Every structure is written in C-alpha cells, then in structure tokens.
From Swiss-Prot:
Family matches, as HAMAP family: UPF0200
Binding site for ATP: 7-14
Name of the molecule in the record: UPF0200 protein PH1008
Keyword Nucleotide-binding on entry: yes
Any GO MF annotation of the entry: ATP binding
UniProt keyword annotation of Transcription regulation present: no
SUPFAM superfamilies tied to this protein: P-loop containing nucleoside triphosphate hydrolases
C-alpha cells in the first residue's frame, strides 16, 4: 500500500507522517528529495535555490520529476515492508508516476487542509531555511505550490483531515483517519 500525503506547506503533513512512523511505517519526504538534489548540484537550500531545483528537475524529467527521483527508494521499501507513506506529493503527474510504477499496489491519497493564516504562523514558528519569512513570501510559495497542481491532487483525495483546530484535536483526527486507512491493510 502506498499512501500519498498532500497538503499546502504548514498544513500538518509532518504530524500525519509522525503518526504513521509511530506505527513502524516508513515515510519518504518529497521535499527531502528536492533538498538532496539541491545538495548534489551544489545549490543552496534557500527558498530561491529549492524553487530553482524543483523547476529544473521538472524541466529535465517532466512534471512527475520529484516522484521519479523517489521511486527507487519507494520500490525498496515496498519490497521489504509492503507499505510506505510519501509525504508532500504536489502534482497530478506525480500521482500518475506512482500509480504507473506501482500498478499492483493500492495507492491512497490523504489530504491535509489548513487555513492560510494558520499555516503562515506555523511556518514562521517552524523556521526551516526554506520557510517563508514574510506574508508575501508565503503567498508566493502558495502560488508556486498551486501552480504545480497541488489543489488538483487534494481534490482526488480518498481521505481529508481538516486542520483548523487545536493540536490535541488534530492529533485525534489523525489517529482516527490513520487507523481507518490501516484497517484496510494488508
């Protein structure tokens, strides 16, 4: 089973990924694939550098590029464990790459939705090097994400978690959905 996590930056994908990890399920981050690629190419992991790398790999490999970069890792995990979570899918082309490559596996899309102002505050507190520092940077990043087709992927979701609540309430929602998904595996 392949579980694709989709959500705008700061929506809570990382918390959902932690819930799967606590159950011993491996998680691969699409964002890490871009950060690793930036490192390989000697490009700084700044918002501009990561944007450049993400656009460059898509130019070189097509719109499903980031999925293509992660497929070898996913293949190995599926062989060993039979289940993997892929955090940060952004485009319908990436979904298609996973479905094409793993046509014998069940592929589930789990979307996490959270309001923009809430996400902006979370990202400011998180403070990762590629996180936006200003509201305009945040809006630019959202525009880029939406340009990749993240909204389309969210509309294809098999499950949706709305993260507009307290942390504890969000944790309860996560546990409920994760349990439901895993009840169908293997």
């Amino acid at each position: 089973m392949i579980i694709l996590l989709v959500g705008m930056p700061g929506s809570g994908k990382g918390e959902v990924a932690k819930a799967f990890r606590r159950r011993g399920i491996p998680v691969i981050s699409m964002g890490d694939a871009i950060r690793e690629e930036a490192e390989k190419r000697g490009i700084p992991k700044t918002p501009e550098g990561l944007k450049y790398v993400s656009l460059k790999v898509r130019e070189e490999l097509g719109p499903g590029a980031v999925a293509i970069l992660t497929i070898p890792k996913v293949r190995g995990i599926i062989k060993r464990k039979g289940i993997v979570v892929i955090e940060g899918v952004r485009s319908p082309a990436e979904v298609q790459e996973f479905r094409r490559e793993f046509k014998n596996e069940r592929v589930i899309i789990l979307a996490i939705h959270s309001p923009p102002k809430v996400r902006f505050e979370r990202l400011r507190r998180r403070g990762r090097s590629d996180d936006p520092k200003t509201w305009n940077e945040f809006l630019d990043r959202d525009k880029k994400e939406l340009g990749f087709g993240i909204g389309e992927v969210m509309s294809l979701a098999d499950y949706v978690i709305l993260n507009n609540c307290t942390f504890n309430e969000f944790q309860r929602k996560i546990e409920k959905v994760v349990s439901k998904i895993l009840s169908n595996w293997p």
